[in-house]
């Protein structure tokens, strides 16, 4: 009897998070009607036309991912040109985990209950896209704004010192950008589930979403690797904004254009059915109740789920050095550039950053290809073996990056002739190969942990909402740890990226062992890898 009562309590607790992130059964019926009637068209509409319309209704995901790719590849290096030291760059990224943990659940809660005539999801997509456009313009023009707020009037081609006003403007824009990204992505993904619920099914909707994210990533990294924006549009250059800064402006101008176009297409084609006020589920107690119920559910998680959370946390600890410093490593260790050095040094650094963006493009391609293979591998080898192998591969690739960085810097001295600056062709080629290969374990990172968590919670009576909620905690906490400790570690090793990659490789090796020992045997996997990692 006691076991039965305990099982009831656990089932209720596990269902709590899911209940807060979904609507009543009548709403699910409306979702199916909406999919059949709006995007799907009438009964006479061909299946091909329905799927094409559904495809373009998700176009906003590509526009958002384009901007996210620019953020990942260009903003850590750019922040250092404004005077933010290498050891404090990680602190500018601390808003990511905060936004992912706080904004997404709250936006998801209220988008499920929105009764505007535009629909449940489109109001949040519209507002989020507008904030993203404003944010990227603030970032792109931060140097010019800082000059008007009191920064040096010396020309950017000769000035090598900090520009603190510009740095503060940049940080404000960066934080707004992260919060806006999280405002859009949750409702956009939920809308695809709404619109595909009838004719196509949720797997088709999520596949289209992932495909648009892949397209956005490839185009974004191509834009970041382009060093011709300042030549095509000379007016981008100002006394406060030289070549590298002007290239950043040009890339972000295209981001605004793509976001506006993709948002307009989505707003037009995704004809949502408005939600009636009487159908709104008001039993949750408000958006903040999401977090209360989530933490209550932690008390009744199955033991296997705690092991999944631990392995997930260590896995993400191994990845953050690469995610934050990938293009900076290419600019510093491989190209021997300096973001706040002389004009020649800054140009070399910028060339390395753009080469790193090209490497991230290769990474995205490898990620997309690998995502199609992962389900078969998981069914054949089990998910935990695939997860473990991916961590050992990260360990090997991080070791190669450490070795390449050390070899590149060993014979280099800044005081030597200018002919020694720039990359060694062989080392540059190896670095690009590493960037491409790391897309393979990244595909595992963005799919397998979610699938394992979903299976473990489902076996104990929980749901997808519970799995996503608790797994977010395991991702957010290590991000905060890295953001707060990366500075002191960086200072202890004289501002290089190589030690950070060494630490990441050590965590990857530990996680590879833990995955084999701790994780349960599961063979399922999510439908497609998510191209955008982290928060």
Swiss-Prot record:
Specify the superkingdom.
Eukaryota
CDD domains membership: MFS_SLC45_SUC
What keywords are assigned to this protein?
Cell membrane, Membrane, Sugar transport, Symport, Transmembrane, Transmembrane helix, Transport
Q: Which Pfam families does this chain map to?
A: MFS_1
* Record flagged with keyword Cytoplasm: no
Localisation? Cell membrane
Primary site of residence = membrane
Q: Which InterPro entries match?
A: MFS, MFS_trans_sf, Suc_symporter_pln
Any one Gene Ontology cellular component term annotated for this protein:
plasma membrane
Stretches in topological domain Extracellular:
75-87, 144-163, 225-249, 324-354, 406-429, 487-498
Residue spans crossing the bilayer: 54-74, 88-108, 123-143, 164-184, 204-224, 250-270, 303-323, 355-375, 385-405, 430-450, 466-486, 499-519
GO biological processes: sucrose metabolic process
Question: What membrane topology term does the record carry?
Answer: Multi-pass membrane protein
Molecular function GO labels: arbutin transmembrane transporter activity; maltose:proton symporter activity; salicin transmembrane transporter activity; sucrose:proton symporter activity
Please tell me whether the keyword Transport is annotated for this protein.
yes
Q: What pathway annotation does it carry?
A: Glycan biosynthesis; sucrose metabolism
**Topological region Cytoplasmic:** 1-53, 109-122, 185-203, 271-302, 376-384, 451-465, 520-535
- NCBIfam families to which the protein is assigned, alphabetical: GPH_sucrose (TIGR01301)
What does the UniProt function comment say about this protein?
Responsible for the transport of sucrose into the cell, with the concomitant uptake of protons (symport system). May also transport other glucosides.
Q: Which family does it belong to?
A: Belongs to the glycoside-pentoside-hexuronide (GPH) cation symporter transporter (TC 2.A.2.4) family.
Q: How does it assemble?
A: Homodimer.
Q: What is this protein called?
A: Sucrose transport protein SUT5
Name the species this protein comes from: Oryza sativa subsp. indica
């Amino acid at each position: 009897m006691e076991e039965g009562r305990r099982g009831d309590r656990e089932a209720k607790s596990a269902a709590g998070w899911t209940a807060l992130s979904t609507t009543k059964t009548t709403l699910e019926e409306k979702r199916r009607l909406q999919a059949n009637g709006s995007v799907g068209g009438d009964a006479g509409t061909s299946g091909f036309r329905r799927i094409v319309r559904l495809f373009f209704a998700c176009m906003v995901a590509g526009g958002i991912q384009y901007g996210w790719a620019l953020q990942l590849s260009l903003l850590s290096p750019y922040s250092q040109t404004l005077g933010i030291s290498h050891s404090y760059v990680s602190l500018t990224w601390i808003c990511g985990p905060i936004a992912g943990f706080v904004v997404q659940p709250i936006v998801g809660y209220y988008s499920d209950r929105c009764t505007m005539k535009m629909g449940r999801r489109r109001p949040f997509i519209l507002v989020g896209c507008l904030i993203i456009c404003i944010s990227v313009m603030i970032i792109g023009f931060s140097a010019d704004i800082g000059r008007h707020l009191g920064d040096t009037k010396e020309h950017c081609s000769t000035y090598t010192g900090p520009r603190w006003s510009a740095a503060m403007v940049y940080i404000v824009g960066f934080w707004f950008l992260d919060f806006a990204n999280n405002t859009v992505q949750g409702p956009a993904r939920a809308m695809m589930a709404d619109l595909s619920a009838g004719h196509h099914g949720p797997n088709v909707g999520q596949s289209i979403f992932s495909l648009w994210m892949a397209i956005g990533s490839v185009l974004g990294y191509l834009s970041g690797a382009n060093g011709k924006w300042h030549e095509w549009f000379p007016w981008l250059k100002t006394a406060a904004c030289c070549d590298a800064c002007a290239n950043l402006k040009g890339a972000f101008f295209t981001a605004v254009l793509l976001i506006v176009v993709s948002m307009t297409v989505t707003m037009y084609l995704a004809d949502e059915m408005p939600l009636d006020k009487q159908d709104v589920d008001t039993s949750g107690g408000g958006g903040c109740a999401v977090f209360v119920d989530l933490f209550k559910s932690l008390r009744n998680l199955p033991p296997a789920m705690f092991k999944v959370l631990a392995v997930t946390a260590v896995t993400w600890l191994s990845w953050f050095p690469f995610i934050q410093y990938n293009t900076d490593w290419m600019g510093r260790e491989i190209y021997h550039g300096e973001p706040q050095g002389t004009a020649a040094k800054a140009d070399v650094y910028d060339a390395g950053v753009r080469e790193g963006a090209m490497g991230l493009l290769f990474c995205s391609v490898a990620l997309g290809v690998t995502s199609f293979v992962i389900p078969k591998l998981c069914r054949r080898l089990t998910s935990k073996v695939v997860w473990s192998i991916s961590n050992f591969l990260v360990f090997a690739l991080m070791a190669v990056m450490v070795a390449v960085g050390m070899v590149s810097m060993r014979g280099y001295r800044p005081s030597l002739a200018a002919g020694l600056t720039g990359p060694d062709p062989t080392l540059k080629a190896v670095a690009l190969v590493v960037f491409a290969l790391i897309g393979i374990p990244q595909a595992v990172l963005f799919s397998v942990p979610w699938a394992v968590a979903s299976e473990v919670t489902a076996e104990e009576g929980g749901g997808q909402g519970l799995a996503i909620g608790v797994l977010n905690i395991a991702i957010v906490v290590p991000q905060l740890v890295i953001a707060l400790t990366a500075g002191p570690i960086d200072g202890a090793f004289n501002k290089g990226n190589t030690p950070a990659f060494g630490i990441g490789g050590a965590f990857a090796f530990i996680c590879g062992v833990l995955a084999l020992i701790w994780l349960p045997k599961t063979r399922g996997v999510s439908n497609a890898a998510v191209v955008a990692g982290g928060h």
